């Protein structure tokens, strides 16, 4: 349960508006961990969030990503932007089999202590879906809302 909460916290925090962020400072301990784990990262921007967590946005090998550090400067998770075709085949097949034809808006890879999962946001007919899947293509969570026109 704790792992699920941490996973959800990373996803929710990743979608927080920059308005919730304040001083763009970092922690030297987190900077050290970051530089070891993400050597070669560019366009690095540190932001301290209202909950005390640090978010670092960066580009690594041409791919945008964000990592999150807790108050003790421990890395709690990383969210990486992907193209739909970069998702594991099992994830793509599950979406195709369960939802049929979709218009994918966003695909993200979430890595934390629980492992790797994927969040795919897509539209279908008059609904917008946010689906979280395991690396094996198992659906972990589905949220849907009606598209207002």
Outline where the language-model segments fall.
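Interaction-mediating elements
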Residues: 22-149
